């Protein structure tokens, strides 16, 4: 584990009182698609801090332009969600053995609840036979960096739970 992840984990544990729950260790010894819910701008920070180094974050090209500096610290690939070639790019990436993190909702929730899940992840999983690893965050919707601050009282450091679900594969 690199020093940045260690410092980040300590910070998240101390200030957000992070509780990590999982039924099985994420080994990522085969291509996997990690699919967290997206309730805050902090979701990716938590995923980066608690997952192994060899994951690649999938980021919208438009958003990546705004995050140039922090993106230098992680492994990522940009996609244009309106281009059908983006799916082909991701299929080839996963087929090459790379595990990826994709937020299946495509955007941060405005309600704090799960929003529409796009079917591109299912197509990638079927074409690559990749393992799907769900991650559920609770508590981040109460952070100042969520988009639902008008519905809940926002806090700088809400208590956060990160639940890593059992991995599974889709049947063709």
Locate predicted features:
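Short gly/ser/thr-rich secondary-structure transition/capping motifs
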Residues: 13-21, 81-82, 144-147
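Residue-level preference for the first positions of well-ordered beta-strands
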Residues: 31-33, 99-103, 133
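Hydrophobic/aromatic ligand-binding patch that stacks against planar heteroaromatic rings
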Residues: 46-47, 70, 92, 123-127
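Catalytic-site beta-strand/loop segments enriched in glycine and acidic/polar residues
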Residues: 93-121, 128
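Helix-to-loop junction immediately C-terminal to a conserved catalytic motif
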Residues: 5-38, 95
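A cross-family acyltransferase "interaction/gating" segment
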Residues: 22, 113-172
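Catalytic core of membrane glycerolipid acyltransferases/transacylases, capturing the structured
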Residues: 28-83
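Short, basic, glycine/proline-bearing loop/turn elements
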Residues: 7-8, 72-78, 104-107
């Amino acid at each position: 584990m690199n020093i940045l992840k260690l410092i980040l984990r300590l910070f998240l544990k101390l200030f957000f009182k992070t509780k990590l729950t999982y039924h099985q260790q994420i080994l990522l010894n085969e291509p996997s698609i990690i699919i967290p819910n997206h309730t805050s701008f902090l979701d990716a920070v938590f995923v980066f801090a608690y997952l192994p180094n060899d994951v690649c974050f999938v980021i919208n090209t438009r958003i990546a332009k705004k995050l140039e500096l922090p993106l230098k610290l992680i492994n990522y690939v940009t996609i244009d969600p309106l281009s059908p070639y983006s799916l082909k790019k991701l299929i080839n990436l996963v087929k090459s053995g790379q595990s990826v993190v994709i937020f299946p909702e495509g955007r941060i929730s405005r309600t704090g609840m799960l929003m529409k899940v796009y079917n591109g992840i299912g197509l990638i999983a079927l074409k690559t036979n990749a393992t799907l690893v769900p991650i559920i965050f609770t508590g981040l919707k109460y952070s100042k960096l969520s988009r639902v601050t008008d519905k809940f009282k926002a806090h700088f450091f809400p208590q956060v739970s990160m639940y890593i679900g059992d991995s599974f594969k889709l049947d063709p």
